Amino acid sequence: MAALRLPTPPPPRAPAPWLHSSHRRRVAAPRGAGGGGGGGGAVPPPPVRTLLIDNYDSYTYNIFQELSVVNGVPPVVVRNDEWTWRDVYRWVYKERAFDNIVISPGPGSPACPSDIGIGLRILCECGDIPILGVCLGHQALGFVHGAKIVHAPEAIHGRLSELEHNGCYLFNHIPSGINSGFKVVRYHSLVIEPDSLSEDLISIAWTASPKMLSFLESDKPDITSSTLWGSLDNLFVTNQSECSTTDGKMPSINDASELDGYRVLMGVRHSTRPHYGVQFHPESVATHYGRQIFQNFKKITTDFGLQTPLLQERKVHSIGKLERSQISSPDLKNFVANDLLHSARLKLWDSVGPCALPKRSSGDKCLRLQWKKIDNFLNRIGGSENIFSVLFGHHSAEDTFWLDSSSVDQNRARFSFMGGKGGPLWKQMTFHLASQRANCGGNLTIRDAYGCTVRNFLKDGFLDFLDKEMQSIQYIEKDYEGLPFDFHGGFVGYIGYGLKVECDASSNSAKSSTPDACFFFADNLVVVDHNNGDVYILSLHDEYSSGNGDGDYQNSIHSLWLANTEKKLLRMDAMAPRLSINGNSSINGNSFTISSSVNKQRFVIEKSKDEYIRDVQSCLDYIRDGESYELCLTTQMKRRTDYMDALKLYLKLRKQNPAPYAAWLNFSSENLSICCSSPERFLRLDRNAILEAKPIKGTIARGRTPEEDECLRLQLKYSEKDQAENLMIVDLLRNDLGKVCEPGSVHVPRLMDVESYKTVHTMVSTIRGTKMSDLSPVDCVKAAFPGGSMTGAPKVRSMEILDSLETSPRGIYSGSVGFFSYNKTFDLNIVIRTVVLHNGEASIGAGGAIVALSDPEAEYNEMLLKAKAPTKVVEECSQQIYNPDRSDSMQTTVS
């Protein structure tokens, strides 16, 4: 197939407002050419400006972070369907705004026009611009020059290979061959067939051996294009239907099992153009010499610019003063011109200093905090369970919350937060999406402390509303000096999985029976420090209300609540010998009665074993065709629980399956209780602007003896499959944090640690970064929600595939429970290991990550293992009278 040649590009549009003459510069004048004033010192090299084409991948912002550091200025990110060729021609050739182009990885194949978008035409037309293609971008480079794209001998995702190369400048200062140390991470199912390379392309890198490496270098062994479009009309169609056959599969791609698995092609370059491609992922946290590759590409760019007469006149966009929010917001569709600006611009909020109240705007609040501390108190009264029961456990604990660090082993969590219906500022916010598509808005109901209810339609959705609510709050930092925790009052509740349509997903498969988000505004709360046993009592009031007389009233109400709560706690100290700390006891005398007919109810899994295994196989097929690297498949199990004591169930769950990010939430108006024993943090932002994610990928049951337990722990630690799962999600979370964190700040202090809990061992990693100052807490959540450990990667395509396989909505499961503090911090978990009680029904979600190494039968068993703890607790709470024989059930059940 000959190299493609496209029509002459159209004339450019008018200059964009962000590209002014003051932002342009020409290539530095030759020595001796004169110039402005000066001391004659060396001129620092100009930064390199990169256009980064995003193929809807979940690793693009890892490349963004690397290029920001290497180039000295962040790249401009544009999705592959966001610019037309007219736009590219304008900015690359007329405005001369970019020095080079990088084409990102992504799902699918370059043979499918909508998978690669504008990238193909860029590779065809931009012959005088240095271009680096990564993974899908690499395959696209081969495709436009006639190479065949075929299935790899084996789908490789999250695993490492040693490489050898030919000394090409892209690999300058990088060793080559077996045991050289040049190990790279691979995420791909398709490859360029080496024998199909035209004279235009030169092979520059290959796998050095057939041996695949896991991150810990486990020795476990590893268990074409027949249809290419020949016309421009077919090649550049944008209709998704053009990419599929009647059975919904991608166009035919040859099976490449006959290819040599030993020397898989890992890099190519063009013979005359400065175009390079690498099949592996240099941006991965586990790739060796990844940054060196980007540095070499920068050097290729600068050398090419000096050697090419055409580029001597190239005008390059300077580092200048571009809006940080435009460069680094989660949605970069607002970068270029006013007609492309996203309608929801970020509203920046200036921090309030500790010395004076800010000027008030309409609707603003200035919250002041009062607090008291009781030293070394927790152990004297039998633990945090007794505090919650006495202060908030009455009336079935209606409208209460408890962010419960019920597992504090190994300093995994330190603080618990609890509260109920509070003072004048308390309110409950309940949100339902209007439909299941993006940008649909939804209906919000607000109920205040006095019982008044207001209903509104939110055109821009719940997260936008929450962001504006937080922006309207001012505060005085000195109020919480001395407090060792970040939640000082504010919003506490959950975000359902369906709110993904406000975070880059295009749609939901079905409507959730539970609200899509539900939060309290908590103005009164009690905090427990599990490290030293201290207990804190906190209360908020609105300083701005003093102008109409309400401030003094609020202040007195909150002072009274502080005093009364302190008295109740001290009374508990005096009564400590008589307090029950048995999680099986009833709360405040509430009886626990279940009829025998209810006892006979059983959990029924939404899909049979055969159906679930078929779904796993479908996931493997999608992975093999390059549509995803990892798919987090889930299912739901349900049973009737009409008379279940929800709080009693939670107390039993926290005892049998303690977890650092456990939670209890009750929304009485919705007949909804959430009993969560999650071991996983989704995302946290502390007062030092540090973002942290702690994804879990990899789970195995505890052993019956210490010897068996240690054997199982090591089995998980060295599992190649689980390491691959974990690495993929770590790179995904690095990407999500990279959208909103300062360039160069995203790092991984803990990679693939094994943590042990009461019932399971899990593989956990920690990712951190420093939030950019002009982005809000909600911006950070929108950049990363839903948690990648519950979707897979690439996230957007993976969510679409999962929606097509999962037949019911996830609802609260896979979402997040936690807080948004009034002082602009937050901490959210991943909702797993959770029982949701709603309108007399208990539901539990469970699943697992499907990767190329997955075994369908093992995946089904892992799903059952993850559901075991919560289902066991529900069964125990409902079997005081009747204990059925589970072996005679005709339905798929969990016990």
Curated annotation (Swiss-Prot):
The organelle targeting sequence, given as a residue range: 1-48
UniProt entry keywords in alphabetical sequence: Chloroplast, Folate biosynthesis, Glutamine amidotransferase, Multifunctional enzyme, Plastid, Transferase, Transit peptide
Gene Ontology cellular-component terms listed: chloroplast; cytoplasm
GO biological processes: 4-aminobenzoate biosynthetic process; folic acid biosynthetic process; tetrahydrofolate biosynthetic process
Occurrences of domain Glutamine amidotransferase type-1 (ranges): 49-307
Enzyme Commission number: 2.6.1.85
Region (PABB component): 387-875
PANTHER family assigned to the protein according to its UniProt record, in alphabetical order: AMINOBENZOATE/ANTHRANILATE SYNTHASE (PTHR11236), AMINODEOXYCHORISMATE SYNTHASE (PTHR11236:SF18)
Protein name, as recorded: Probable aminodeoxychorismate synthase, chloroplastic
Species this chain originates from: Oryza sativa subsp. japonica
Lineage: Eukaryota, Viridiplantae, Streptophyta, Embryophyta, Tracheophyta
Gene: ADCS
